[in-house]
Structure formats: C-alpha cells, structure tokens
Amino acid sequence: MGLLDLPAPVFAWTDGVLSGTLPPLARLALWALLISALSMALYALLSPQAELKRLKTEMRAARRALHDHDGDFDGVKTLAARSVGLSLRHLRLVAPAALIACIPVIMLIVWLAKAYGPAMTDSGLPLDMRVTGGDAKLRVVTPGREPDGAGSGALLAVFGADGTFIAQAPLSPRLTRLEKRRWWHWLAGSPAGYLPPDAPIDSVQVHWPRYETHAIGPAWLRGWETPFLALAVVFTLTIQAVFRIE
C-alpha cells in the first residue's frame, strides 16, 4: 500500500455502504460533491483569503491602468511590470494551498481507478493476459478445481519457462498488472502484490473489460472518469462562487 492508498479502506467501506441504496452513477456524483467540498474547504483554510481579496483588487486596478494608459512606452513597461509582479505574487500565495487541497482528490482518483476501472467477466476470466520482458507460463487455478478453471477464489499462477514457480495473485479485476516493485509504488501500491525482484520477467498484464457506470453516449464516455471529473469541476466552481473563495 502506497501513501496515496492510505484512505482506500475508508473509501471502500463508505462505497460499500452506499451501494445498498445508490447506483454507481449516483455514488460517483456523491463522491464528486464530497471531495470538491473537502478540497475547497482545505484551500480556503490554508490560503490567505483576506490578502488575496486585496491583491485581486490591486490586480484589477493594475490591468485597468495598463488598458487606459495613453502615454510613452516607458510608462507601459512600468505598468506591465507591476501587473506581472502582482500576478506572480498571487500565484505564490495560492500555490501551496492549492497543492495541498489537491491531495485528497488525487487519493480518491487513485482508489476510483481501481474500484470502478475494470469489470469482472461472466466467465471470471480476463479478456487477455500477456507477459513482458521475458518468457513465462500463466495458469489460472481455483482450489478444488481443474487448472485453468475460473471461479471464486481463482488464482493466477506464474511459472518460468522451465516450470519454476514465480508468483501467484488472486484473479480479480483488481489484478491488472503484476510486476516487480518500483520506486513509484511507495505512492500508489499494487493491490495484487509484486513479482520477486529476481523474476525472469518484467510484468504480467491482465486485461479486463471496462466497468460502465451508465449507458449514455459512446463506450469511451461510460467509465467513471467522465461523470466524476465533470461533476467535480461543476461542484468546485459552484462552491467557490457561493462561498466567494478567492
């Protein structure tokens, strides 16, 4: 589990409770509202709102003075320099709070990509499985069943070209890639685990069908990304306007 995965159990529990009463699209809308409110609240608390209000007044005055200037070029340079300086100061004031406020959003997106990304097939088997960076044999095994039979508790077992066991992982839509641990996994971990460092292959890529949260529009619009991101933007702008957050 990486740092961005820390709130994942809370997200999963909450989504599980909501799933009893709300369809996927409604849950995504609720997630978008909650995360928008949280991120804007963090931004408002961490940013110097009073100073930003004064600064925006100065910025408007500087732009107006530049627009209305009818003198020599030196005067234009002075007014332009002041306008740019105020804009850079504004960026310096909002950047730290904005970056911190983005962290909960990123954490939720990381979880949504795993929870609402791939979908289980009717057979329980993925659409395709590929090995990269070497040669290996893949076998789907369910305890109590014949090899290559899918079902509850199915495992994906990875063997070397010589038949040596390498690794295994639960076969579910959470397993989209089985690879060696990389430096970026301290941020976002692999829910399926990792290949051993000395494995003769680089990764196993497992392809599942895309989970569709609604039936509106073409297939590429039916995933979780479009409704969640669109609603998050709308909710964020609405909250900013209603509460007059600078």
Regions found by a protein language model. Give the residues of each.
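Hydrophobic alpha-helical transmembrane segments
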Residues: G16-A44, G217-A230
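Alpha-helical transmembrane signal-anchor/signal-peptide segments
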Residues: P48-A62, L112-T132
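Membrane-interface amphipathic helices and adjacent TM-edge segments
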Residues: L45-A95
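Transmembrane alpha-helical segments and their cytosolic interface motifs
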Residues: A81-G117, P218-A232
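Juxtamembrane "helix exit" motif at the C-terminal ends of alpha-helical transmembrane segments
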Residues: A12-D15, I103-G124, I239-F243
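Beta-strand-enriched, solvent-exposed domains that form extended recognition/catalytic surfaces
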Residues: D122-V206
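Juxtamembrane interface at the cytosolic side of transmembrane helices
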Residues: A44-T57, L229-E246
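Short, aromatic-rich amphipathic segments at membrane interfaces
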Residues: P9-T21, G193-E225
